[in-house]
């Protein structure tokens, strides 16, 4: 699978080297090739990244209204009323042009492209005498004779502390800043009383320290060539600049209204007071004391599910019934 993505990436690398190699010496040509390889590949998929970021922000912008509609939908008992609410939800999504699948789809392209980019750089820097994608054996051999400040690009990073340390510190700084900005953006739109979003935010917070530590450890103790450290620096710098641009666009075009901030603050309060757990515990005690109430509640939920199911069918078929329905 990764080899498929290596071919377009290696093709881009070959084209840049043909350009720079026509008027620069071998080492400088290859160094610039790596820089522009990162810029080209990440530049191509930047619109997909933006699409995912924008859909995430749009989802947050429409959430206060959607939450209100969902609250009404939970207590609906009439099919026609449920149909009206479902239509309002659909119109709300259309008004905001929200499509959650469009936010997820780019990941299926972005992740393999990043892996393909990393694999090309890693294999070109390796020791195997074989072509890499569209790069011929001659191209690979030329790359492996290239140096930066007298250090071969394919030497292990741990053998050249004086050269690698500044590049590694820069790379770790770039990725840490990028993660912190993304973390703060996520914090502003996270509902803390919902388990999955809250845990995803905690996971990202942990990654702020884990990722730099992992990269530092691998760089000094693993078989990582100097090329990869240089690639990290270029890649993380581009990602940081991209994130800053996205953040500026979000603040200007899609600012978060006070309703979103208020919803987040209320969710934090509910999470701290463990409101959901208290309600569940109270319901269990109430049902335990009155088993008939538990049966009545289960029957009501069943009727409510039937009403929603029929309402969704009607909305999907755009055919509202004139009289009472089976669910009623």
Regions found by a protein language model. Name each.
Residues 15, 47, 51-54, 58, ...:
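Membrane-spanning helices that line or support transport/gating and their immediate boundary helices
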Residues 242-328:
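Cytosolic, positively charged, low-complexity intrinsically disordered regions immediately flanking transmembrane
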């Amino acid at each position: 699978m990764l080899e498929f993505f290596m071919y377009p990436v290696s093709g881009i690398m070959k084209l840049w080297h043909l350009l720079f190699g026509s008027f620069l010496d071998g080492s400088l040509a290859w160094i610039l090739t790596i820089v522009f390889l990162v810029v080209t590949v990440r530049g191509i998929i930047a619109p997909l990244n933006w699409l995912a970021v924008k859909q995430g922000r749009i989802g947050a912008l429409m959430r206060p209204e959607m939450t209100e509609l969902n609250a009404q939908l939970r207590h609906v008992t009439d099919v026609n009323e449920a149909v009206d609410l479902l239509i309002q939800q659909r119109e709300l999504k259309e008004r905001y042009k929200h499509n959650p699948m469009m936010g997820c789809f780019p990941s299926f392209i972005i992740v393999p492209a990043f892996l393909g980019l990393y694999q090309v750089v890693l294999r070109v820097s390796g020791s195997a005498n074989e072509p890499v994608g569209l790069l011929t054996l001659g191209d690979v051999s030329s790359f492996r004779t290239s140096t930066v400040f007298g250090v071969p690009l394919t030497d292990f990073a741990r053998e050249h502390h004086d050269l690698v340390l500044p590049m590694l510190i820069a790379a770790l700084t770039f990725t840490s800043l990028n993660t912190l900005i993304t973390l703060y953006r996520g914090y502003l739109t996270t509902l803390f009383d919902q388990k999955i979003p809250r845990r995803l935010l905690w996971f990202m917070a942990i990654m702020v320290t884990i990722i730099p530590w992992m990269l530092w450890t691998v760089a000094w103790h693993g078989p990582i060539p100097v090329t990869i450290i240089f690639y990290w620096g270029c890649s993380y710098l581009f990602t940081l600049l991209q994130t800053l641009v996205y953040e500026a666009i979000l603040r200007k075009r899609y600012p978060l209204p006070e309703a979103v901030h208020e919803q987040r603050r209320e969710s934090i309060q509910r999470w701290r007071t463990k409101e959901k757990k208290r309600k569940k515990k109270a319901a269990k005690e109430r049902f335990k004391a009155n088993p008939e109430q538990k049966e009545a509640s289960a029957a009501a939920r069943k009727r409510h599910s039937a009403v929603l199911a029929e309402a969704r069918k009607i909305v999907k078929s755009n055919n509202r019934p004139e009289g009472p329905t089976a669910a009623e």
